[in-house]
Amino acid sequence: VTIPASSVTESAAVLDLGCVLPFNFGHHSVSLTCRDFRRGDAVTEFVELTGGRIACEVFGEGPLVLLAHGIGDHRQAYRAVAPRLAAAGYRVVNMDIRGHGESSMDWVSQTGRAVISRTDVARDMVGVIRHFGGPAVIVGHSISGGAATIAAATAPELVTGIVEINPFTLLQKFSVPGFIRVRRYRQGMVRLGMAATGSLRWWLRYLDVAYASKPADYSASMAALASTLREPGRMAEFMKTESTPADAHAQLPNVACPALVIMGTLDPDFADPTAEGEAVISAMPPGIGQLATIAGGHYLHSEKPDATAELIVRFLATRVPEMQIH
């Protein structure tokens, strides 16, 4: 099932966080009661796992939703989405993936190498869900989209649904035609290649093109991220994430829970973002996944939080029975 971009609106109801969230989702109409919820209501908690600890912010009460960011980022990437989900009636756990943000460094990878693999992140996700008393729906961005696939396939009793935002789930192939013809893809690949040398400057330059439009707090959020990445050891941890997504790709046929893939049509990481999302869905069992597109870049949860949160809440309300709010 494909949800066209035209069906996604920047709903004033989501922005308002008042008493009702009315959504129109194709043939479905959903109204969810909510309460005012601010970022200041979050509680920070550190979850001790084998090999390290994961920093989490916890918002709200209700069915559990776990948020996980992408590489070279931190949990503040979901600063606008997490309160919206909590306001819609969910208990939201927003985690820093291993080596990032306030989570500990120097974890031992299941690969035996100095990397942070998708399987590593998936195992951390499952550990966090157990700690908070799952099951849960996982919302994963980029590398964490691939990790969500693995978690769903390997721990189906704990993962009742997955949302993958611009995921690196499939084995990637460099597109020569895309590099020649698609300017945003060319810009993204050049900057990513330079950032892979461990250059914070080039990573920030990549982020500048990865956002198709800038949220109002873009400068402040980038300054906060840069400050985190300048901490001793953080860039080295970031560089450990440059591993193959083969482990996630191989698990796509084993996903049994409902899945939503959200692609930004202006994402510079893919020559054709919509085709990438379609390929992720097609590798899952029939009827499992659906695709939605938003006119935005790689960081939809920061760039287009209203549309992104709306899609997630619709998915939870209409596709995941365990997430129904009564």
Positions of predicted regions on the chain:
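Active-site loop/oxyanion-hole signature of alpha/beta-hydrolase fold enzymes
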Residues: 87, 97-139, 310
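Short glycine-enriched nucleophile-adjacent loop
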Residues: 145-156, 162
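Conserved alpha/beta-hydrolase catalytic His-Asp/Glu region
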Residues: 173-174, 195-254
